[in-house]
Curated annotation (Swiss-Prot):
SUBUNIT field: Component of the mitochondrial ribosome small subunit (28S) which comprises a 12S rRNA and about 30 distinct proteins.
Residues covered by region (Disordered): 110-130
Principal location: mitochondrion
Name of protein: Small ribosomal subunit protein uS5m
GO annotation, biological process: mitochondrial translation
UniProt gene name: Mrps5
Biased composition (Basic residues): 113-127
GO cellular component labels: mitochondrial inner membrane; mitochondrial small ribosomal subunit; mitochondrion
This protein's UniProt keywords: Mitochondrion, Ribonucleoprotein, Ribosomal protein
InterPro entries xref list: Ribosomal_Su5_D2-typ_SF, Ribosomal_uS5, Ribosomal_uS5_C, Ribosomal_uS5_N, Ribosomal_uS5_N_CS, Ribosomal_uS5m_N, Ribsml_uS5_D2-typ_fold_subgr
Domain of life where this protein originates: Eukaryota
Amino acid sequence: MAAAVRAAGCLPALCSLQAGHFLSRQLSLNAFPVAATSFLAVKTALSHGSLSSRETRRNHCLTSLSHVLQTQCCVSSPGNWTGQQCRPYSFFTKLTAEELWKGALAETGAGARKGRGKRTKKKKRKDLNRGQIIGEGRSGFLWPGLNVPLIKSGVVQNIGQRSKEEQQKVEATMVEQREEWDRKRKIKVKRERGWSGNTWGGVSIGPPDPGPNGETYEDFDTRILEVRNVFNMTAKEGRKKSVRVLVAVGNGNGAAGFAIGKAADRGDAFRKAKNRAIHYLHYIERYEGHTIFHDISLRFKRTQIRMKKQPRGYGLRCHRAIITICRLIGIKDMYARVTGSMNMLNLTRGLFHGLARQETHQHLADKKGLHVVEFREECGPLPIVVASPHGALSKEPEPEPEVPDTKLDWQDVKAMQGLKRSVWFNLKRPAT
């Protein structure tokens, strides 16, 4: 480090030189004992006879001070001694551009975090470094190798300066280019419509990102099921806001999964959720590639789901989240009814829980040791064998008294007995 500059006031008396101009910070000699010792040694030597001559004292003083103050001053010549330090230090050099923009746009208060303030008067942040060229300035100097080519027509160019008119044209072009960039940024790309309106439910965000070993998931698609703002009360930051995203992924061929992503930014939450869902896949068995094997009735917490197997061409008549998940799985025909709580997370977990545990025809045939047959309306009384046991065939038929323990739904009972009618059934309408 350098010595103190308070000693600069003693230099004219000691060295018989003109005092230089020191643009430096005032420091104490006690803070730099090495520099103080060197300076005192110079002062002692100058007062004795060995260095009594005028020229000898001047040369020795300059040599000693150049070592003592080597980081604080520049010694040019014995006759013209000047010390200068250039250290730009201001309020704007202490803060980053991000912090300055936050102060200019008032984004650091509690009102900005809670969404207060009129959005119509809100200023937008600009990247002032965008479009800047190293060497360009208001003076219009031309620096070879920076803002102009170093060699032109085989000749090395010299430093020049634009005229006032040319400099005004260059600045006007830069302003026009920035305005064009701002207009392009305001243009919104219309994303795919989800379930309704401008909500995120049902919107596709593409396949998950490639894995660390180079594996890709181009045949998978990701659909958003729910986007919610959640808050956590912390001692340091207070009411801290986060975005929680529930997504489902699938390839349309039986492989599907779901996961939750949480982050302060919505885009980061989307990325976390879809990259996590690809690691929690379920394989869902499908009957003939279009529907479930049998009717399923389940209850997950406060949500009840009843799913029914349907013939080909029936379509998906379900809750909109169930329709989205079934398309990711590859189920094309199914009826589902949801009662109770409509919590999206419980609905998704209950649906995967029921579909992943359905019993296939082959598993039923192996368990019973009998052929599994299906009766279709178009085939009449002719049974169609859909599965046969792998082991020995049981010669004893299934006992008759065995009745499946199936809970009946009152709405289905009313429909079977003809008690279920429309609310408009007895309404008398005027003749038209």
